[in-house]
Amino acid sequence: VEFVDDIEIPASVNLDNCYERILTWVKGRFTQPNVTKGELLSDNQDTRRITMRIQQNLVFKNTALVTDMTKVSYNLTFAVKEENGKKKCTVTMTDISYLYEENRENGGISFTAEEWITDQEAFNKNKTKFLKTTGKFRIKTIDLFELISNQTKETIDTL
């Protein structure tokens, strides 16, 4: 499972400046309290590519009596480039895995996105609605990627 978003960079923006701004934002964004681990795997100024390994909590439900959540781990890549005369930042989320109910006696359940959030796994047999258990993982993972993409766009828009 891979999520990709190409974010347009205005023609007037210098790509090196854009790369530096995104790198600064990334270093702050992935140290927030819901992020349990944010590791910068690589940042290459020559290719303008940033790769991170993130582990964070995704909360499905949080009440006084029940907290339903999972730890999600994923790789996140930001590539600032020019292709066919257009400047863009490609945001890619890959290698997604989950650790669910880790506080249980058995240490919880580990699984990958391919095992849990694909169309085949997340929908009922008629493909008309999400399954209760797997659907929530798909929805929250897509929401997370959209949030990261939107925050990246906002970061670019400040240049």
Language model region names:
Residues 1-159:
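Ser/Thr-rich, low-complexity intrinsically disordered terminal regions
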